[in-house]
Amino acid sequence: MLEAQGSNHGCERQAPTASPASSAGHAVEVRPGLYLGGAAAVAEPGHLREAGITAVLTVDSEPAFPAGAGFEGLRSLFVPALDKPETDLLSHLDRCVAFIGQARSEGRAVLVHCHAGVSRSVAVVMAFIMKTDQLTFEKAYDILRTVKPEAKVNEGFEWQLKLYEAMGYEVDTSSAFYKQYRLQKVTEKCPKLWNLPQELFAVDPTTISQGLKDDILYKCRKCRRSLFRHSSILGHSEGSGPIAFAHKRTAPSSVLTTGSQAQCTSYFIEPVQWMESTLLGVMDGQLLCPKCSAKLGSFNWYGEQCSCGRWITPAFQIHKNRVDEMKMLPVLGSQTKKL
């Protein structure tokens, strides 16, 4: 806080002009009009106004401005988040980036802050500059540490920002990256899975009367019942083969890929609606065809190792030799034809 100096030997000294960073409580300017700081930056709302900051994004356990606080003209957004690796920050990034972008387009100066100003707020600002400048995680991190050397996002946020980059700087809920991430988050929250969110499940292909253009269905080899679509397959990079079986990897994987795995003997997929009753309340078990009860594979919320050596968590594993791939081609009359 800057204060005017008192008189000295009868001579008045004029108070120095406060910079936006000093008035905002030790916030640093990352981009013109974009500031990064901790709780001290919002301790005195009047300092924000003096600094010309009229938009504040709080990433913390509590909002910076309770109802009625702040000052007239202040725009604020509160994102509840703890500085823990298991915190889901990824799901909020689009909203945060949009808030910052909108405020700056209106000529507002924006402050992004958390409690200490080194992890949560850094992760959000990184997401913004990654998207606006099309930067890699590493490049954005280097930029932030240049202006704020103490910046250090936790390993969970680091993984989430790399997923954000892999999805093209937006949270794509249809992406295999996001589906695998969402499954891992559900596993962390629910040691006893009695109530699974419906959005976790892919639609049962038998409930859709018309196939999508160039769609690929996977059917039970024994009874031909449709089981899942190609879009439900969660790709992964191939492991190092037999040597990978020396230990089991249970840490979150940042090596997801949408490519194919030629040496893998199973598909790892997102849960499908017909699996719901099988998955509730248990951590592992068999996956059986809902029509003929033929064994298709297995599931384990703690994860399974693919034949290529890659550890997948959680795992919904369908053996390739238990299903047939059927490509559906559109024909006249909005029907579909099997290739």
UniProtKB/Swiss-Prot annotation:
It catalyses: O-phospho-L-tyrosyl-[protein] + H2O = L-tyrosyl-[protein] + phosphate; O-phospho-L-seryl-[protein] + H2O = L-seryl-[protein] + phosphate; O-phospho-L-threonyl-[protein] + H2O = L-threonyl-[protein] + phosphate. It is found in: Nucleus; Cytoplasm, Cytosol. Residues 1-25 are annotated as: Disordered. Residues 26-170 form the Tyrosine-protein phosphatase domain. The active site is at C114. Substrate binds at H115, A116, G117, V118, S119, R120. SUPFAM superfamilies: (Phosphotyrosine protein) phosphatases II (SSF52799). The modification N-acetylmethionine is found at M1. It comes from the Eukaryota. Keywords: Acetylation, Cytoplasm, Hydrolase, Metal-binding, Nucleus, Phosphoprotein, Protein phosphatase, Zinc. Binds 2 Zn(2+) ions per subunit. Coiled coil: none annotated. Disulfide bonds: none annotated. One of its GO terms (cellular component) is cytoplasm. The modification Phosphoserine is found at S334. Its cofactor is Zn(2+). SMART domains: DSPc. The keyword Hydrolase applies. One of its GO terms (molecular function) is protein tyrosine/serine/threonine phosphatase activity. Its EC number is 3.1.3.16, 3.1.3.48. Dual specificity phosphatase; can dephosphorylate both phosphotyrosine and phosphoserine or phosphothreonine residues. Can dephosphorylate glucokinase (in vitro). Has phosphatase activity with the synthetic substrate 6,8-difluoro-4-methylumbelliferyl phosphate and other in vitro substrates. Monomer. Belongs to the protein-tyrosine phosphatase family. Non-receptor class dual specificity subfamily. This is Dual specificity protein phosphatase 12.
